[in-house]
């Protein structure tokens, strides 16, 4: 998932499908998608499921999953990126950026010969 996709999520974008918690990546007026094929449903497991459950457990006084980065008109993914990169630098030092995780995931999926259409469904194309 691209950072802007996640940053612009609504709480209602987290849905249950066939008993599995998923995130529905779709365009919103405040955040478009890079391509039409970027719209997708991503199943959440492990720490991503845990994080989604924490978001959904918060008081629902705001429709956004990350209200700090949304004003209803625009998603500020650059601010989210800067905050995450600052946090990451404090944890593992220089030389890593948050955007690298998406590319690492795609590289690891290719390394285990995951079909490219599945890689695109997970990471967007």
Regions found by a protein language model. Give the residues of each.
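C-terminal catalytic core of tyrosine-transesterase DNA break-rejoin enzymes
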Residues: 5, 86, 100-125
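Active-site lining segments that contact anionic ligands and/or coordinate catalytic metals
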Residues: 20, 39-41, 61, 93, ...
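Residue-level signal for well-ordered alpha-helical positions
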Residues: 9, 54-58, 112
